A protein has these predicted regions:
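Boundary/entry segment of secreted carbohydrate-active catalytic domains
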Residues: 1-25, 270
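Enzymes and membrane/adaptor proteins characterized by extended Gly/Ser/Thr/Asp/Glu-rich
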Residues: 16, 33-163, 185, 190-204, ...
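Short helix-capping segments at alpha-helix termini
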Residues: 66-73, 176-178, 225, 259-264
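Structural motif corresponding to alpha-helix initiation and N-cap regions
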Residues: 25-29, 215, 283-284
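Structured alpha-helical segments in the cores of large, soluble enzyme domains
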Residues: 30-36, 135, 174, 215-224, ...
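Short beta-strand/loop segments at the ligand-binding rim of alpha/beta enzyme cores
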Residues: 4, 11, 76, 178-181, ...
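Phosphate/pyrophosphate-binding betaalpha-module
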Residues: 166-187, 193-196, 206-228
Length: 293
């Protein structure tokens, strides 16, 4: 691959960001042409990209040809499918004949990791059948702040060891079903009082406190073979000494995630359209800072 193609492979975008309305619902010729200029590594589908079950399946099946014809590797075809009431783009769309699973908080409250494995197998099973190969799940956040506005029932709970056990078995189940899991949101979004979708989200945990709690599920996910970790736009000033989001921090990514936790897989940034980033950086600057980190 050329240098331009190799750089392009670092990006995952929404389909319509490549060719506008022509690529929102279909892996069209316009999308194929756009890949010649923007050879991205994959796409993530949201509700606006899902009109019918057949349309989604066709898009995902035909995407491979678009990428192959552009001379770049087959794409990551991703979706946010955590399960439960809040973040399950496929199951909650009403378009697909798939079973819905409970919130992860309910699964965690059972204390039975086998239930988490069943959820992972169920979600990844139907995603693979539809044509997805990446799921931005499981949520590895430890819910230590009961007033957290964004994680809540998406987390397995407040016990880091239990959350870690649930995350680890879910990772293994998803891999066995043929879908790549992505543990999120490092270094942990469960302690914040803010929602990073709308603005800055801050944890005041020290490095020692994070290591004893928030990092535990990520360590277990990594030990279970998780190939991807999503870094959130969470400020950790007691660790970094500044207000830089973790997604743009070399200390958090290279120093902690790669160094202390020994992660050698793919590091994914949360969306650069979220308030925690765009209120301080434009998307282009944020992307460069993330790659540098």
């Amino acid at each position: 691959m050329s240098l331009e193609q190799r750089v392009g492979q670092l990006f995952m975008v929404r389909p319509e960001q490549l060719a506008g309305e022509a690529s929102r619902l279909a892996a069209s010729s316009q999308l194929g042409a756009a890949l010649e200029r923007f050879p991205v590594g994959g796409v993530c589908l949201f509700s606006q990209n899902m009109q019918t079950a057949q349309q989604v399946e066709d898009f995902l099946a035909q995407a491979h040809s678009c990428w192959r014809n552009a001379g770049i590797p087959s794409p990551f075809l991703a979706v946010d499918e955590e399960g439960g009431d809040l973040v399950a783009r496929v199951a909650n769309s009403g378009l697909f004949n798939v079973g819905r699973v409970p919130n992860m908080g309910e699964v965690g409250a059972s204390g039975d990791p086998a239930r988490a494995a069943d959820v992972g197998a169920a979600n990844a099973g139907y995603l693979a059948d539809i044509g997805f190969n990446v799921d931005f799940a499981p949520v590895a956040d430890v819910l230590t702040n009961p007033n957290n506005p964004v994680i809540g029932p998406r987390s397995f709970g407040s016990d880091p060891q239990l959350v870690g056990d649930m995350v680890a078995v879910q990772v293994k189940a998803m891999l066995e079903a043929g879908v790549l899991p992505c543990a999120k949101h490092f270094p942990g979004h469960g302690d914040t009082s803010e929602d990073s979708h709308t603005g800055a989200a801050v944890t005041q945990r020290t490095a020692q406190e994070l290591a004893a709690c928030e990092y535990v599920p990520f360590k277990k996910a990594i030990s279970a073979g998780c190939p991807m970790v999503m870094v959130g736009h969470i400020q950790a000033p007691q660790v970094n000494g500044d207000n830089l989001p973790a997604s743009l921090s070399s200390q958090m990514i290279d120093g902690v995630l790669r160094g202390e936790l020994g992660f050698e897989g793919v590091v994914v940034a949360d969306s650069f359209e979220m308030g925690a980033v765009i209120q301080a950086f434009d998307a282009g600057e944020a992307a460069v800072r993330f790659i540098q980190a």
